[in-house]
Amino acid sequence: MTDLMNKLAAVVAVASLAITLVAAGFAACAAFPQTTEMLAEAFSGNGNPGTPFSHDELVQAAVATRDYTVGSNDREAVFSMLHAINEGAGTPYADAAPDELAAAPEEYTLPADALSHLDDVYHVVAGARIGLIVVALVAVAACAHMAVRVGRRALGGVLMAAGIAVIAVFALLAAWVVADFNGFFAAFHSLFFANGTWTFSYDSLLITMYPPEFWIGMGAVWLAATGLLSIASVVVGALLRRKRA
């Protein structure tokens, strides 16, 4: 019975640690406004020279929209931002009331369908955050069990297995992104959102702030963070599995 429990703990440890490594990469993307600001500085406005907003205004909008989507979800704050950038750019909606700004063309504002999609993202992220914290705690507990009840070499095996599994999966996903970014992007969104709720015109403010290059960059950040942590997991695991002299 003890052997069975230890094997079960090993499986749980590998699975929960692998999920936690992936989640850590997502946290690097979503938890820090600096990530959005860096990528917006590099890519916002790409492909839409006709946007009424300056690059700095688009970066300001991208950071504020990121807070609405994965942070405060404060609609008043996001409309305050929309008013500020329209006023700064001197658009026809510079002095528009909130309801008029909400009904403006999507080149100037975040219309109802865009805000609805951002609300959907907020709810997915909020729910995932709780679940991933629980998974991380399970990973810590299962790894502690392996270290205390089975031994350091068993823990090393868990660390290596989780890291190698994540590296293999991310290598396949990276190849998919390189071969067909649009297909990957569509498949990823279809996991969480209904068809038709996350597509917007290329000259909309939302896509102007976050063009495809922005999301490729965000994926690179996720890949780098998760990849480095996974490599560290493999290295530490290999060290733990070494026989002591």
Regions flagged by a language model, labelled:
Residues 1-37:
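Hydrophobic secretory-pathway targeting helix
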